[in-house]
């Protein structure tokens, strides 16, 4: 009995230690604040971005192929992020001077359709690793001294709405990032859900049947606004050309 009790206590202690070590903010929780140097000066995150949507985007190392492609991808799509009211901050465990050199290199040598790019978003120098630890971006089994590719999408109230981590050898899909932000914004604004492969303008799901038979009799037009597939999948039409 004593041995069993000891095993249980050791297991609970180990679980507690693991939980503490692995702790980072989750969906629905407040985004941790930090103040660090960046390529745009000192950044107080998320406060400096006000009531905008925010993306915290971590990368492993400056002057590497995948990271360069990703940051250029963010720059190529800057206008799309602006149209969604999104502010971006990029972070890695690199010195500020290295960030500045890398930014200058990308703006000087990278282009899209022959036009030079501008890195408008700040690249944060998290040399101490404190920011990366706060957001759980250091995964020891991958590389304990370098960030994995993390993405935190944060709403205007500074609540985390989406979290994703990618391995060091896989670049992220910027179109998917934009799609996720658009979906989060729509579902916060309206009481709707987005189905698989949803794209902006597509029809959306509603949580339950949107009308009763009595309501339909009073307003027959409701039938033209919604349709169902089976008993519990009800769609709302979004007035996109070619859709129901």
At which residue positions do the language-model features occur?
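Chalcogenol-based redox active-site neighborhoods
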Residues: 18-244
């Amino acid at each position: 009995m004593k041995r069993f009790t000891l095993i249980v206590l050791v297991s609970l202690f180990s679980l507690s230690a693991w939980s503490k070590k692995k702790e980072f903010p989750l969906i629905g929780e407040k985004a941790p604040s930090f103040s660090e140097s960046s390529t745009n000066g000192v950044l107080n995150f998320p406060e400096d971005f006000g009531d905008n949507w925010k993306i915290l985007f971590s990368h492993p190392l400056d002057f590497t192929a995948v990271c360069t492609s990703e940051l250029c991808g963010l720059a190529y799509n800057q206008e799309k992020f602006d149209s969604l009211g999104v502010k971006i901050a990029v972070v890695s465990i690199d010195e500020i001077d290295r960030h500045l050199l890398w930014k200058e290199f990308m703006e000087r040598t990278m282009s899209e359709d022959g036009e030079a790019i501008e890195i408008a978003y700040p690249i944060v120098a998290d040399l101490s690793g404190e920011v990366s630890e706060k957001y759980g971006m250091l995964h020891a089994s991958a590389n304990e001294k370098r960030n994995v590719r993390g993405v935190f999408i944060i709403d205007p109230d500074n609540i985390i709405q989406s979290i994703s981590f990618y391995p060091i050898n896989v670049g992220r899909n910027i179109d998917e990032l934009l799609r996720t932000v658009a979906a989060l914004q729509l579902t916060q604004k309206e009481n709707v859900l987005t189905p698989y492969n949803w794209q902006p303008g597509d029809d959306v799901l509603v949580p339950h049947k949107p009308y009763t038979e009595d309501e339909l009799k009073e307003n027959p037009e409701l039938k033209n606004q919604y349709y169902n597939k089976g008993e519990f999948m009800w769609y709302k039409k979004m007035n996109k050309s070619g859709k129901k």
